[in-house]
Amino acid sequence: MPKIRIKLRGFDHKTLDASAQKIVEAARRSGAQVSGPIPLPTRVRRFTVIRGPFKHKDSREHFELRTHNRLVDIINPNRKTIEQLMTLDLPTGVEIEIKTVGGGR
């Protein structure tokens, strides 16, 4: 059974969820089955920086960068599904990775 797997990445979870919802609606309008959006683990990168430029090593500041991930599977896509996905306008700040899974002959 052919399947399109779409991975979404971004720093803002609200924008990411809105983008995933747009993809799900477009796929359902074309008649394909949709699984997701499935939230994947959030990657958290933490940075510790010394506040002062010269000394005062005990005074530090902590920053973190959260990368949120979502997964959407489109099962049995047709030509209309692919056309809908190609014309979809998604906001900036969302990275999209599209793969085809299964359906190999």
Swiss-Prot record:
GO molecular function ontology, one term from the record: tRNA binding
GO annotation (BP), single: translation
Gene3D superfamilies referenced in this protein's UniProt entry, alphabetically: Ribosomal protein S10 domain
GO CC, any one term: ribosome
Top-level taxon of the source organism: Bacteria
Entry keywords, A to Z: Ribonucleoprotein, Ribosomal protein, RNA-binding, rRNA-binding
Subunit structure: Part of the 30S ribosomal subunit. Forms a tight complex with proteins S3 and S14. Also contacts protein S9.
Reported function: Involved in the binding of tRNA to the ribosomes. Part of the top of the 30S subunit head.
Family: Belongs to the universal ribosomal protein uS10 family.
Name by which UniProt lists this protein: Small ribosomal subunit protein uS10
Gene encoding the protein: rpsJ
